[in-house]
Each structure stands twice: as structure tokens, then as C-alpha cells.
Amino acid sequence: DEVSEVVQEAANKVIVFVPFKHAIDIVADRLRKDGFSTEIVSGAVSMKARTKIFKDFQESDDPRVLVIQPQSASHGVTLTAADTIVWFAPIASVETWLQANERINRPSQKNKMTIIKIYGSEVEKRVYDALESKEANQKTLVSLYEQELKA
């Protein structure tokens, strides 16, 4: 229900990252039941099909929502038709977290971006907090290297 509420309130397209294979179909089916055109991108989807889904998402009205397994689209994909990301559950990899969130943060993005984290327990909230802390540390580290290179 929370995911559908976010999609309903979003002005533009939405990406929902679902880390667990068994939950991807459940989330997509619920969104479809609630009337949202939805496509799935996971490891089970061929590269040719992914390319078509991404192209349609960027260039057409439908699909409105992509339900994505984060590892399947965390690198090399521009999805700026969306300005909202929903994390259905946290992941362990800070690199995948950063890269997945960057799918909507491109020079062609014209809208304010929103990242929403859904959690069902205090442990999941702490995992999100840890990801954000690692993200801040990684950005600080990169900044230090950049300063050193300029010196």
C-alpha cells in the first residue's frame, strides 16, 4: 500500500527498487492491481527486453513504474523520466545503493529528485542509516582525493 501511495502522489514516473526476487512480482502485481502501468527488470529479464523497457520508460507514457532488482540496473542506465525512487527494502552494498540512486540523477534531470526508503523494522532503518553514513564517508574520501590532485 505504501508503494502505491507514493506512486499516486508522484508527479512523474517512479522507480521501485526491490532487492528480493520473491517480492518483485508481488510488488509489481499490487501496483498493476492499483492501476499503474508497471514493468519488471530483474536478472530474469533478457538484455534485449531490458533495453526496450528502459527505452519505453524514457520515451513513452507507459510504463509509469519500473520495479527493479537493484543489481540489474545499477550501472550505465539513465532513467530521468523518473524523479522518484522508492526502496522497498535496504541492501547491503553501498556501491549498488549509490549507483542505483544515480539512475535519476543525470544532467538531463529537470525535476527535484526524491528517494523514499520503506522499512518494516528498526533493523532495516539502521541498515538505511548505515548506507547513508557510508555514502557520506565515500563522498568525503573522493573529495579529499580531488583536493590532493589539485594541490
Model region roles, listed by residue range:
Residues 1-19:
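Conserved interdomain hinge at the start of the Helicase C-terminal
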Residues 7-9, 56-60, 77-79:
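Conserved catalytic network of the ASCE P-loop NTPase/AAA+ motor domain
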Residues 15-17, 25, 32-73:
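Conserved helicase ATPase core of P-loop NTP-dependent helicases/translocases
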Residues 20-24, 45-46, 72-73, 91-93, ...:
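Short, solvent-exposed loop/turn segments at secondary-structure junctions
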Residues 25, 29, 51, 77, ...:
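Alpha-helical elements of the RecA-like P-loop NTPase motor core of helicases
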Residues 66, 85-86, 104:
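Short, well-ordered beta-strand core segments
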Residues 77-90, 113-117:
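A short beta-strand element within the Helicase C-terminal
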Residues 92-151:
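A conserved SF2-helicase RecA2
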